[in-house]
Amino acid sequence: VRIIIATVQIPFVSGGAESHAEGLKAALIAAGHEADIVAVPFNPAVPERIPDQMLACRLLDLTEIHGAAVDRLIALKFPAYLIPHPNKVVWVLHQHRAAYDLWNYPFEDLSASPRGVLVREAIRRADQQLAEARAVFANSKNIANRLGHFCGINSVPLYHPPPNAGSFSCARETGEYFFFPSRMSATKRQSLVLEALALTKKSVKVRFAGLADSPEYGKRLKLLAAKLGVEARVEWLGFVTEEEKRDAYAKAVAVIFPPVDEDYGYITLEAMLSSKAVITCEDSGGPLEFVSHLKTGLVTKPNAAALAEALDQLWQERDLAAKYGRAGRERYEQMGLSWSEVVRQLLA
């Protein structure tokens, strides 16, 4: 079977979505299929041009390549899932959230645009085309709930393992830090962690890994750390290799991941594979599908004081952090996540 995986690429931005597409491609090839990725350029920073990019996707014809039929299109992201195909399956990583739950959220460009309302309505109308697919899957229950709530579209949650799942481990000796690996953006809430650090009673230290959405945002976070007086307890690792990331997981006391209504979040699963407790928030979305409060981690209210209390607790009670981490690893094993099951469902 010849399969195209349709997604988008924001130039100079790479993260979980790109790993997701590559993982799916590898799984399809391993199952004996011919598969490739078509990544459509997408620039959400210019809201007025988003309808043009939607139209460009709608006009693409991927039904055949060099005279050979494409048997199936598996579409992952907005606006690539608008590409028409008679045998299309959509596995929604996320919609354009600025038109939905992140409307009016700080640092989102759409609501601040003079034509923002018009573009938002165009996006919402276009998303109704999801119903044309032969099947709609969601990357998590959280995404499935959003699709139902905002679009009235039913979808099936379909989990998958993170990249290189078999490579994660837990070190015998932990370091003196919590680990927070993530793209730096307002929705990931690195700023909340900095504010919590300023309120901790213990000398908690945090290592942040990942690049900022923009150089300006990265500078803003560092200025905030200085303003709060916590810069000596923060380490900015920036880009890290996969090996460096796994090593940081392995030696961490625990993992912090408190995003705003996250879609899925490899970070939670990678922490569980590394036998690390996860500290997250009540409104963090995807992580809550895997983190059980007082069993595999701590779930706090989304404010600095509550998060600081959780940081202090696991910083002081290392045995408890290790216990939660072991339980997280057991929970991951019980879920039985596999790419072979993903392929089976997408091609059914």
Task: List each model region and its residues.
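Membrane-proximal helix-turn-helix segments that form the acceptor-binding/catalytic region
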Residues: 108, 112-136, 144-145
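Aromatic "clamp/platform" in nucleotide-sugar-dependent glycosyltransferases that forms part
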Residues: 260
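Short hydrophobic beta-strand element within catalytic cores of glycosyltransferases
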Residues: 277-281, 291
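Conserved acidic donor-binding segment of nucleotide-sugar-dependent glycosyltransferases
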Residues: 293-305, 313-318
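Glycosyltransferase donor-sugar binding loop
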Residues: 205-222, 238
